[in-house]
Amino acid sequence: MALITTGNGLIRDLEKFGSVGVYVPLEGGFEGRYRRRLRAAGYTTLQFTARGLGDVAAYLTGVHGVRPPHLGKKSSGNGAAVGNVYYLPPIVGSQLEHLPPKSKGLVLWIIEGHILSDQEVEFLTDLPKLEPRVKVVVERGGDRTFRWKALKDTFSASYQAV
């Protein structure tokens, strides 16, 4: 990798495919540089981890219920012993509503994406088709250099055969 990269290749492929899978060096730092270049190109980025995400489709596009960690305490009410359910708005919809007027769109940068199932990755691949202002970057694994390819090309071999 060059010392100074413009990130134009990643931005071009992200606009072309809508979603890309990236392989990043394990020492880190590269994703921050590319996110900065995406912001400079006019995109708003939202980074979150795939761990504990649950139902990806419900989390991103639908109203979904969450329970706070109970930390060993139990509620004394008639409800569940692990606490109340709080309902949150869809992440994608609420972020798109608050985009700046001149923004090109929203880029969801999902770290630790190697734990996602192929069905979840398939939904993330189709998400830019459902909402054209949304682009998706999923970290699919580690490598010696920062590289990327279309997210649909990162499915496991057994899933592609089906």
Curated annotation (Swiss-Prot):
Identify the species of origin: Trichormus variabilis (strain ATCC 29413 / PCC 7937) (Anabaena variabilis)
Q: Which Pfam families match?
A: NdhN
Q: Where in the cell is it found?
A: Cellular thylakoid membrane
Catalyzed reaction equations: a plastoquinone + NADH + (n+1) H(+)(in) = a plastoquinol + NAD(+) + n H(+)(out); a plastoquinone + NADPH + (n+1) H(+)(in) = a plastoquinol + NADP(+) + n H(+)(out)
Q: How does it sit in the membrane?
A: Peripheral membrane protein
Q: Which GO terms describe its cellular component?
A: plasma membrane-derived thylakoid membrane
Membership in a protein family: Belongs to the complex I NdhN subunit family.
What keywords appear on the UniProt entry? Membrane, NAD, NADP, Plastoquinone, Quinone, Thylakoid, Translocase, Transport
Indicate what this protein is called per its UniProt record: NAD(P)H-quinone oxidoreductase subunit N
Enzyme class (EC, first level)? translocase
Q: What HAMAP family does the record tag this protein with?
A: NDH1_NDH1N (MF_01353)
Care to name a GO molecular-function term for this sequence? quinone binding
Q: What function does the entry list? A: NDH-1 shuttles electrons from an unknown electron donor, via FMN and iron-sulfur (Fe-S) centers, to quinones in the respiratory and/or the photosynthetic chain. The immediate electron acceptor for the enzyme in this species is believed to be plastoquinone. Couples the redox reaction to proton translocation, and thus conserves the redox energy in a proton gradient. Cyanobacterial NDH-1 also plays a role in inorganic carbon-concentration.
Q: What is its EC number?
A: 7.1.1.-
